[in-house]
Amino acid sequence: MHHPPVADDVHTLVVYVLDRSAVLSPPAAWLSAFEQLGVSLGGDQAQVQRFINAWSRLYSATLLLDHLQDGDELGDPWLAAQSEPLQYHFAFSAYALANDELATLTSVLPPARSIRLQRLWSSTVLQLAAGQYRDLTLRASALNATGLEALDRYEELAAQKTGAAFALALGGCAETATDTTALVEAATNAGLIIGMLLQYYDDLLDQSSQEAQPETVTLARAWAASIGIDQAHRLTDIWSILYARYWNALDATLAPLPAPARLAISSLVQGMFGAAPKPITTTI
């Protein structure tokens, strides 16, 4: 079934604009690692690539929505100059394209695998929506909790936003490739860990712009609310602690996967965040 010519023109424009924005499109290195994972699990390369295309459109849609709601740069002068309704429509169009790609893929997968992939996709989209809602409604001034409650709430937010997106990326590639539940679960959980790390990492790098948004819940603010201002570590110390702990969790999570899959994921993580961390020597 072909789209009407006008629809084709609109969709081509959406793809063109989002793909040329380094801010809104996932890096090629990520997509290459996802493909290596799927193929290493026995997936058909063309089918794995189609899932990655669908995920990329979904990821761009969520990034665009997030940047619009936060007033952040869009990475494309033409898109930035458009009216707000049209900018939001680009996010909707990217989401529509993602679902169209997914439908094309699931139509050729084995029926049971197709159903599982669609369930993973839909449950993840619900998580992303919930995470974005919490990001918009949770206020930093409400983090004056006792103990580690503020950090727990921030961790839940990270899991529902970027964590869920990467759980779908890796889990979806695995689901496209194999019917082995243990492999799909390992890939999905690894994606969750990587996505949460990315949320933390970007948050700590984005401190300057966050100063203009005092009510935005950030890792540093959640850390200070839980640990106490006087005891708060420097940002580099916070990252070192988190990276080491999540790396250890990731290493254990990857155990069921074959060596090529483990290598693809560990190389991806080190490309994103730097060399494997040293053992933890700092205590909270």
PLM regions and their residue ranges:
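Short, amphipathic C-terminal "tail helix"
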Residues: A261-I284
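Mg2+-dependent prenyl diphosphate-binding active-site environment of isoprenoid biosynthetic enzymes
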Residues: H3-Y243, W247, I265-V269, F273
